[in-house]
A protein has these predicted regions:
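Conserved SAM-binding motif I beta-strand of class I
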Residues: 19-24
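Helix-to-beta-strand junctions that scaffold the AdoMet/dcAdoMet cofactor pocket
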Residues: 100-102
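Conserved SAM-binding loop of SAM-dependent methyltransferases across substrates and taxa
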Residues: 5-18
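A short helix-to-beta-strand connector/capping loop
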Residues: 18, 41-44, 133
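S-adenosyl-L-methionine
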Residues: 28-69
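C-terminal catalytic and target-recognition region of SAM-dependent MTase-like enzymes
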Residues: 91, 105-186
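Class I SAM-dependent methyltransferase "Motif I" SAM/SAH-binding loop
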Residues: 2-6, 111
Length: 186
């Protein structure tokens, strides 16, 4: 989702995926994505659709994918946009998590330098709770070493990519031994 010129979808097909669908609202980017797929001799379905609407449609119809990749454009370019970016990242990740088959993979990205990795992980934790799933994060990465960042400008560490398995939430994961339970009267 937010496929832009198709990099993730095309790479998935080249790596052996059975199918890939790229979703974006940018018609020019989708045209380029189609050309990129042709140049790489892979078949990818590209759709000019609002990502939020598409994910809502999927979950409404009970449709899920083995892998969902969320790579939106920068959502917070200035301090005034941070609160809205938190809500948007929360919404898109909740929907994305609901669209992943149990045990499937979610790759979610943020290129907003004003959203720290810690904040992004907090957003994902909240989104997982709202989606009724548990995330098992197995990799967190960012820009490669050709994108150095300064200690006095942490926003330069703008790219965050979180790879996680998505599992349905069951109370079993959070059962504590009886002597460790916390109650209102404790």
């Amino acid at each position: 989702c937010f496929c832009y010129t198709g990099g993730f979808a095309i790479s998935a097909m080249l790596a052996g995926a059975r199918s890939a669908t790229g979703i974006d609202l940018d018609e020019d980017a989708l045209e380029t994505a189609g050309e990129n797929a042709r140049l790489n001799s892979v078949k990818v379905t590209f759709q000019h659709v609002n990502v939020f609407d598409h994910l809502r449609m999927m979950t409404g119809k009970g449709m899920q994918s083995d892998v969902v990749i969320l790579d939106p454009a920068k959502l917070a370019g200035c301090a005034e946009e941070i609160k809205r970016a938190h809500r948007t990242y929360g919404d898109i990740n909740r929907l994305g998590m609901q669209a992943v088959k149990p045990g499937g993979i979610l790759l979610t990205c943020s290129c907003s330098g004003l959203i720290s990795e810690r904040d992004f992980l907090s957003i994902l934790t909240r989104s997982a709770a709202e989606a009724g799933v548990v995330l098992q994060i197995f990799k967190i990465t960012g820009a490669s070493s050709d994108h150095p960042f300064s200690t006095v400008f942490p926003e330069g560490r703008y790219l965050k990519a979180v790879f996680a398995r998505v599992f349905p939430f069951t109370k079993k994961e959070f059962n504590f031994p009886k002597n460790e339970r916390v109650t209102k009267n404790s």
